[in-house]
Amino acid sequence: MASFNSQLKMETGLHERDRAGVQDFVLLENYQSEEAFIGNLKKRFQEDLIYTYIGQVLISVNPYKQLPIYTDDHVKAYRNKHFYEMPPHIFAVTDNAFRSLIEENRGQCVLISGESGSGKTEASKKVLQFIAACSGNQTTVEGVKDKLLKSNPVLEAFGNAKTNRNDNSSRFGKYMDIQFDFKGAPIGGNILNYLLEKSRVVAQMGGERNFHIFYQLLAGADEALLQELRLERALDTYSYLTDGLNGTVTRINDADSFKQVQQALTVIDFTKEEQREIFGIVASILHLGNVGFTEVEGNAKVNSRDLVVTAARLLGVNASELEAALTHRTIDARGDVVTSPLNQELAIYARDALAKAVYDRLFSWLVQRLNISLQAKETRASRNNVMGILDIYGFEIFQKNSFEQFCINFCNEKLQQLFIELTLKSEQDEYRREGIEWIPVEYFDNKVICNLIEEKHKGIISILDEECLRPGEPTDKTFLEKLTQKLAQHHHYVCHEKAPAHIKKIMLRDEFRLVHYAGEVTYSVNGFLDKNNDLLFRDLKETLSKAGNGIVRNCFPEKELRSLKRPETAITQFRASLNNLMDILMCKEPSYIRCIKPNDLQTANVFNDELVLHQVKYLGLMENLRVRRAGFAYRRTYELFLERYKSLSKSTWPNYKGPGGPKAGVQQLVKDLGWDEEKYRVGETKLFIRWPRTLFDTEDAYQEKKHEIAAIIQAHWKGLMQRRKYLKLRAQVIIMQSYCRRKLAQQAAKKRREAADKIRAFIKGFITRNDAPNGFNEEFIANAKRMWLLRLAKELPTKVLDKSWPHAPGHCEEASGILHRLHRLHLARIYRLKLTPQQKRQFELKVLAEKVFKGKKNNYASSVSTWFQEDRIPKEHIQRVNDFVASTFGSEQLKYQSFCTKFDRHGYKSRDRFILLSNKAIYVLDGKTYKQKHRLPLDKIDFTLTNHNDDLMVIRIPLDLKKDKGDLILIIPRIIEFSTYIIDTVGTASIVSIVDRNSLEHNVVKGKGGVIDIQTGAEPGVVRDKGHLVIIGTQ
């Protein structure tokens, strides 16, 4: 930053001006003196001030060294500054063009001109650097900027070479369009290339090199890549690197440059496969150059087929086909196809033509591929938001000048003519048209030279094309003869025959001389026709069109072979592309950077006055200075000027409505601004401002005014936006209200309809509620079922003995029955789960009793509510009975015991007894003595009961068990209980029989029988009556 401040001080300090010179030649006192002009340039050059203005034209002197004037601090310092606020710099020119592009929407182009070695390529890089630094930092923008910046290393590697005058000379012309969006961020780009010097591929002058990429590949590729390409690092291995021993330049690091190229290719979206194919093509050219030929009986033969095989592999073609195409030529003459062998000279020509064509088309493909990567993704950008940068080869005068120098110098003539048209001529013509008082400035108009070269039917280009296309055997010599014949009298054409004696001594007979605007150049016609025809034998095109290498196949399409049209000559194509370039530049607002080479040695701090003066002359800088000094710095149409600055006067703001239109408005505006008449002139359609300071002051006032107007507009705008917002919100609320009201009304109507439908359906359902389900009562029935289920869930019985059950609608009766049964089972299950073992035993006995006695014996009902007990012996007798059981039963198990009354078989006298039930027998004990009276096995006896309400039991004893003693007649309290235990013990109910009679017979001793009558009375009892027994049961 310190060096920048010191430079700024040197540029602006008055006491430093004598030492550093003036920064704008317009300020030079003796502005008509060439000596003063050169002296000012030299002063600044010696102080490392390489930039100087002529008005808005920037003069750049190549320092041949790195200067610290392109840092980020410099970019910030020059950004958004007026042109003359800062010292001269390429950043100032770029910023001025950039702001005009964005703020005024005027297409711009930066024209960089000068001869070879004057620093044009470096200047174009600095323009790109400033644009990249000033644009946005979004991810997409960064991607575009990276691609724009990385395109330079690629184009320089393949299109630049070391010449005797320049280590990095552009051997092609380049015009780059950069497209911006409305915010000034680059969104894409496009590159046009012009006339690559492809002859350099096969031969170079002494001390010069081939294109950089060949040396970069050999120096920077890793061993694996070199092995794949079959290359060696030694430069003298390859014939096409003719200066191989001296090919390494200390100022150039080819290995680092190759890594930069690889990185740039990756950034610009070249795939790994594409990069491999590109380097393969470059390597194939080196191998092709080493292919030699011998001549056997007039036919060329390849010396080393291995080299052809290697080149064919890298190009992706058949080696045999490539070898045949290099040594033979096929001619199709009106359907007659003839293949003839080539001699050694023609084979070498075919080989070199192939190498040049492959490299030339590879370069064109690279540019196309770059353009695809740089293509803007947005299509809405204004067509005027484009800035062009022209970096084209400078004027060249070599010891030996050929077809390439002729084309390059023709291009420079056209650019010089454009410069004259847009500056010297057009500016003076404009003053005359506008009625501005003006003293004409004389200048050399090179249009006469351009016409000499390109005039139809008469110019050198037409003569060259005519000679190339005519039948017969045209040669370079016949071409020169025709030139001399037609142009000998032209003041800018010199031939050997009519040249002055002193020129004849240095001119050869195969040369002609043109007096260019930049000086006299002698051209050798050798190779003019050949290079113009640009002939590549059809056999080679056919071979390459079938290549496996995708890039080669793309560069040599099959449709080219099918075309019968003769291709345009090289010079015709070049002229057409140049004219197209001129059309592009004419529709843009130019910014000029005129580059000057201080010496031919490429050495820092050396200033050759004579060389610089020569460049100043032919660039027309003195004439440009005189026009600028006498002219006006700024001019604009009244409409544009008024539109931009009308806010500076109340008379013209917001719109001028007075008489006289925009011109009168501008006059009123400058009057209100208080301008002196010397500061401006009023033309017919434009306002001319003499001094930049006047415009800058006006612009500063406008920028200040913009803030005031912006505040007013902002306030009104905010008010308008708030009102619009309010109205929009109000409208939205009204719409929402209407929608809500409509929705609510729809919902209410829907509810009413639904309610009516429900009521209607309910009534119909109610009417048909007992019918089979139909369309009317289905919902009602379903609702009835639902309500019944809900009611049932609340009214379910909770006790087993509670047999009540809620009433069910008709359609639910079946389900009600099932649910009732299931609920009963459920309650029973719950009850059962709560039972103790004793309770469970009781229920088992009770169930057994119910099964046997219910409905069969009248006193069964009285037994239900009483728990069955296994022991019915009174307490006072229990011990004695238990003693009997313990002494008598043994393994038998006591099941039941009770007291009872036994009646004799004769006389029916009653006796107290105890009856015991074991698992095997019935025991009858004496009621007093506790002695066993009977033991009756259960499997031998059975029991008879009556169906009356009595406790009578007759035990039928088989005759073989009791010898004629007969049956036992017993009155047993709780007869149902005792009988149930018997049946439970035996396991079958058949042991007990119930008779439905009023009398019961029983067996007596010796087969005699007795009768027991059964009667019903108020009280139970037993009566003995005349030989029979009467049992009285209750009702």
UniProtKB/Swiss-Prot annotation:
Subcellular location(s): the record lists: Cytoplasm; Cytoplasm, Cell cortex; Cell membrane
Q: What is its main location?
A: cytoplasm
Q: Where is the TH1 domain?
A: 857-1035
Residues annotated for ATP binding in this entry: G114, E115, S116, G117, S118, G119, K120, T121
Offer an example of a GO molecular function term for this protein.
actin filament binding
Residue stretches making up the IQ domain: 696-728, 729-751, 752-779
Record flagged with keyword Ubl conjugation: no
Name the UniProt record assigns to this protein: Unconventional myosin IC
Where in this protein does the record say Phosphoserine is found?
A: S304
How does a null allele present?
A: Viable and fertile, but adults have a shortened lifespan. Flies deficient in both Myo31DF and Myo61F are viable and fertile, but adults have a shorter lifespan than single mutants. Flies deficient in Myo61F show normal left-right asymmetry of the embryonic gut and normal, dextral rotation of male genitalia, and the same is observed in mutants deficient in both Myo61F and Myo95E. Mutants deficient in Myo31DF and Myo61F display stronger sinistral rotation of the male genitalia than mutants deficient for Myo31DF.
Give any extra note attached to this record.
Answer: Overexpression in larval epidermis causes sinistral twisting of the whole larval body. Ectopic expression in tracheal precursor cells causes sinistral spiraling of tracheal branches, giving rise to a spiraling ribbon shape instead of the normal smooth tube. Ectopic expression in epithelial cells causes increased elongation and a clear shift of the membrane orientation toward one side, so that the membrane is no longer perpendicular to the anterior-posterior axis. Overexpression causes reversal of the normal left-right laterality of the embryonic midgut and hindgut.
Effect of changing F395A: reported as:
Abolishes the ability to cause laterality defects upon overexpression
What the record says about family reads: Belongs to the TRAFAC class myosin-kinesin ATPase superfamily. Myosin family.
Instruction: Enumerate the SMART domains for this protein.
Output: IQ, MYSc
Function (record text): Unconventional myosin that functions as actin-based motor protein with ATPase activity. Binds to membranes enriched in phosphatidylinositol 4-5-bisphosphate, and can glide along actin filaments when anchored to a lipid bilayer. Functions as antagonist for Myo31DF, an unconventional myosin with an essential role in the establishment of body left-right asymmetry.
SUPFAM superfamilies the UniProt entry points to: P-loop containing nucleoside triphosphate hydrolases
Q: Where is the Myosin motor domain?
A: 21-703
- Provide the effect of K120A: Abolishes the ability to cause laterality defects upon overexpression
Q: Give all Phosphothreonine modified positions.
A: T310
Q: What is its quaternary makeup?
A: Binds F-actin.
Q: Which GO terms describe its cellular component?
A: actin cytoskeleton; brush border; cell cortex; cytoplasm; microvillus; myosin complex; plasma membrane
Residues of the region (Actin-binding) are 578-600
